[in-house]
């Protein structure tokens, strides 16, 4: 499976085309809209989320609530486009109109794609860069992730995400929660945090950053349960599932690090405390005493829960802008200000769920049969029986 997205932040719409989704998957707009709404929530979101009412339109690949096996096209309209029709229109405009309407940006913002992208593509107007590099694009990545979650659900895999840290405020590690319990708690938390004792402190940190014109980042964690043993591969570097998951996390806007299992903590512990001892019994088959590997060894699943974390840097669009240089005059200026969030960590956690879900669904479809859901389900059942008796 693969997908490609298109669209600008203030353009008419965002589009994603999904290829390789098996036939026979139950899919309706409500499944996707539920995830889009989750992305819009979270303490610290900016005014843009008050403007947009993200809903999906399925325009191909689905008939009467069932996928056909052909490419699926999803679109999400940008409600704010009505205020940008001249600025972001596709048709040529006159030189006079250009000066009046283009809202040309020549001051790159530190921490963004602005300067590097302008140099790479030769854009003298940085708006041509920021419109596409904006995190608004993650709207349709969440839509793609919603489809992946439907695949996982029908294949017996559950997934959930939560916030571990915001602006230096850390949540306690809460053990032995089911995926359903994680989902219920986070959906009722403004910061998607499991630890209610630090929830208000996280919100205060976000408010303090906003009031001072600053921004803060944090850490999110995604957990998936129900993956069969042996999904992925050790044979080639580009087929290792942990590599794909880390790459997916790092592809999210403003994410600067990824961990699987205990992650970097493994560097501080001896091997005897890091590696997960193997157990077997007639009822469960092969299991592990611990899950420090985060459900992945040698590029393959171990059958234990997948645990992936990502670190998001503070959003670089600040209301007290940092120093920059005008690319036309080369004079020092304060960077341009675009409407933005003070903290998007809770929403980014939803995006992280989506990209992890896509990689897991892709791995299952690739390994157990690509054409139709019924065949994939049968193959997984047979594989699980084989693995248990191995």
Curated annotation (Swiss-Prot):
Keywords: Amino-acid biosynthesis, Aromatic amino acid biosynthesis, FAD, Flavoprotein, FMN, Lyase, NADP. One of its GO terms (cellular component) is cytosol. Its cofactor is FMNH2. It holds the Pfam family Chorismate_synt. NADP(+) binds at residues 39, 45. PROSITE patterns: CHORISMATE_SYNTHASE_1, CHORISMATE_SYNTHASE_2, CHORISMATE_SYNTHASE_3. Its EC number is 4.2.3.5. It catalyses: 5-O-(1-carboxyvinyl)-3-phosphoshikimate = chorismate + phosphate. Reduced FMN (FMNH(2)). Pathway: Metabolic intermediate biosynthesis; chorismate biosynthesis; chorismate from D-erythrose 4-phosphate and phosphoenolpyruvate: step 7/7. The keyword Cell membrane does not apply. GO terms for molecular function: chorismate synthase activity; FMN binding. InterPro entries: Chorismate_synth (IPR000453), Chorismate_synth_AroC_sf (IPR035904), Chorismate_synthase_CS (IPR020541). One of its GO terms (biological process) is amino acid biosynthetic process. FMN binds at residues 132-134, 253-254, 298, 313-317, 339. It is an enzyme of class 4 (lyase). Homotetramer. Belongs to the chorismate synthase family. This reaction introduces a second double bond into the aromatic ring system. This is Chorismate synthase 2. It comes from Bacillus thuringiensis (strain Al Hakam). The lineage of its organism: Bacteria, Bacillati, Bacillota, Bacilli, Bacillales. The gene is aroC2.
């Amino acid at each position: 499976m693969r997908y490609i997205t298109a669209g600008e932040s203030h353009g008419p719409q965002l589009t994603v085309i999904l290829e390789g989704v098996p036939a026979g998957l139950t899919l309706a707009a409500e499944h996707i809209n539920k995830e889009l709404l989750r992305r819009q929530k979270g303490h610290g979101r900016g005014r843009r989320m008050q403007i947009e009412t993200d809903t999906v339109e399925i325009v191909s690949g689905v008939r009467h609530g069932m996928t056909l096996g052909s490419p699926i096209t999803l679109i999400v309209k940008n409600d704010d486009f009505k205020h940008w029709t001249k600025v972001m229109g596709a048709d040529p405009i006159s030189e006079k109109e250009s000066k009046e309407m283009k809202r040309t940006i020549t001051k790159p913002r530190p921490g963004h794609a602005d300067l590097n992208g302008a140099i790479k593509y030769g854009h003298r107007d940085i708006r041509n860069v920021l419109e596409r590099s904006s995190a608004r694009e993650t709207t349709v990545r969440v839509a793609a992730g919603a489809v992946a979650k439907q695949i996982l659900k029908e294949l017996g895999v559950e997934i959930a995400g939560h916030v571990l840290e915001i602006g230096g405020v850390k949540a306690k590690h809460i053990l032995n929660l089911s995926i359903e319990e994680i989902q219920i708690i986070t959906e009722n938390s403004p910061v998607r945090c499991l630890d209610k004792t630090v929830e208000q402190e996280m919100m205060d940190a976000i408010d303090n950053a906003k009031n001072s014109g600053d921004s803060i980042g944090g850490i999110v964690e995604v957990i998936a349960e129900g993956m069969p043993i042996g999904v992925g591969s050790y044979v080639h570097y580009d087929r290792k599932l942990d590599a794909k998951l880390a790459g997916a996390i790092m592809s999210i806007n403003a994410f600067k690090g990824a961990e699987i299992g205990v992650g970097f903590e493994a560097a501080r512990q001896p091997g005897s405390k890091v590696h997960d001892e193997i157990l077997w019994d007639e009822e469960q088959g092969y299991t592990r005493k611990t899950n420090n590997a985060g459900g992945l060894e040698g590029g393959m699943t171990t059958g234990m829960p997948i645990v992936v974390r990502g670190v998001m840097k503070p959003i670089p669009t600040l209301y007290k802008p940092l120093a920059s240089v005008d690319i036309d005059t080369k004079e020092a200026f304060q960077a341009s200000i675009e409407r933005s969030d003070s903290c998007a960590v809770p929403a980014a956690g939803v995006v992280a769920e989506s990209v992890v879900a896509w990689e897991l669904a892709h791995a299952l479809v690739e390994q157990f049969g690509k054409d139709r859901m019924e065949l994939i389900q049968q193959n997984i059942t047979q594989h699980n029986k084989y693995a248990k008796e191995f």
